[in-house]
Amino acid sequence: METLSQRLDACQNKILDCYEKDSKCIIDHIDYWKAVRHEYVLYYKARENDINVLNHQMVPSLQVCKAKACSAIELQIALEAISNTIYKNEEWTLRDTCDELWRTEPKNCFKKEGQHIEVWFDGNKNNCMEYVVWKFIYYNGECGWCKVSSGVDYRGIYYMHDGHKTYYTDFEQEAKKYGCTNIWEVHMETESIYCPDSVSSTCRYNVPPVETVNEYNNHRTTTTASTFVGAQDAAVSHRPGKRPRASESEPDSSRESYAHCVTTDTDISNNANSRSPRINTQSHCGDKTTPVIHLKGEANRLKCCRYRFQKYKTLFTDVTTTYHWTSTDNKDSSIITILYKDETQRDTFLNVVKIPPSVQVILGQMSCP
């Protein structure tokens, strides 16, 4: 028991060191996934010996330990393969090599510099969805690891896999879920792809899709019109300016608000914590409130942070266990809440304690019990 505890402690310290280092070297990320693999191997061994709590942490089930360890092994092997190619000298961040991004479409590929495009279903800008076009996609093909860019046409978003156009987002399938007329518009930063209203939903199969390709690595657009049966050509037009996205201009505060507080998104640059990628302030609370910080991120990372916070017990009043919202499908994102006696103590905590850049920091006020 003591040996397992010591090894787990050393392993989690290694993981936290990787978070705090925030390296851009692929070798450091290989070491990170090795540490994650060892962590879940230790958890697995503990669970096999009927140990449910280790270092004041709940030990995951055998199935979870096995799945997490396998994911870590998969990422470690993939990164080791990349490290033997010409791409090893590029910048690689924790986000670029995280498991969540690895399993995002296109799956089992490394992806960098995603840019959002909007698809309006039924021609209604209020019925739109955002999709990601990746500037760089790294995939393991027949000739080893290759680097390509995403492309966009009326049919969907794709990349070239060993010379074959491979779609990872099909707009027709999305239209069946979100639209009624099977007609949609694709809106990018400076151009849009339209389909005339007269085009039948079945006509698109009689001819090749419109070949409007937007290569995001050089912002070069090549357009060739595609003829639809019984209708005029699909049209591509350039917009005079970028329309603000709903996600940018109207942040969804329902997930960020807490204890009857109203949340407003505010970017704070290097004030309270220069390592926090985004800090949201919460205001307009009642009179009897206490300052809090919500830390949002992957559950295991938050557990490691909470474990390290034990060194700074004098800098906060209390800290919760990890939890998540039950009304969302994103169960991978968890939260812990830290309570303070006043804002001075909270500011001291932010200045002293180093929080990993992958963890989102949300300032707020919480109603006193």
Swiss-Prot record:
Pfam families: PPV_E2_C (PF00511), PPV_E2_N (PF00508)
Subcellular location(s) of the protein: Host nucleus
Compositionally biased intervals (Basic and acidic residues): 245-257
Any Gene Ontology biological process: DNA replication
Keyword Phosphoprotein appears in the UniProt entry: yes
Cross-link (Glycyl lysine isopeptide (Lys-Gly) (interchain with G-Cter in SUMO)): K296
Gene3D superfamilies (alphabetical): 3.30.70.330, E2 (early) protein, N terminal domain, subdomain 1 (1.10.287.30), Papillomavirus E2 early protein domain (2.170.200.10)
GO-annotated molecular function: DNA binding; DNA-binding transcription factor activity; nucleotide binding
Region entry Disordered, spans: 230-257
DNA-binding domain: annotated span: 289-369
Modification after translation (UniProt): Phosphorylated. Sumoylation plays a regulatory role in E2 transcriptional activity.
Region: Transactivation domain, residue numbers: 1-200
UniProt similarity note: Belongs to the papillomaviridae E2 protein family.
Subunit structure: Binds DNA as homodimer. Interacts with protein E1; this interaction greatly increases E1 DNA-binding activity. Interacts with protein L1; this interaction enhances E2-dependent replication and transcription activation. Interacts with protein L2; this interaction inhibits E2 transcriptional activity but not DNA replication function E2. Interacts with protein E7; this interaction inhibits E7 oncogenic activity. Interacts with host TAF1; this interaction modulates E2-dependent transcriptional regulation. Interacts with host BRD4; this interaction mediates E2 transcriptional activation function.
Function recorded in the entry: Plays a role in the initiation of viral DNA replication. A dimer of E2 interacts with a dimer of E1 in order to improve specificity of E1 DNA binding activity. Once the complex recognizes and binds DNA at specific sites, the E2 dimer is removed from DNA. E2 also regulates viral transcription through binding to the E2RE response element (5'-ACCNNNNNNGGT-3') present in multiple copies in the regulatory regions of the viral genome. Activates or represses transcription depending on E2RE's position with regards to proximal promoter elements including the TATA-box.
Protein name in UniProt: Regulatory protein E2
Gene symbol of the encoding locus: E2
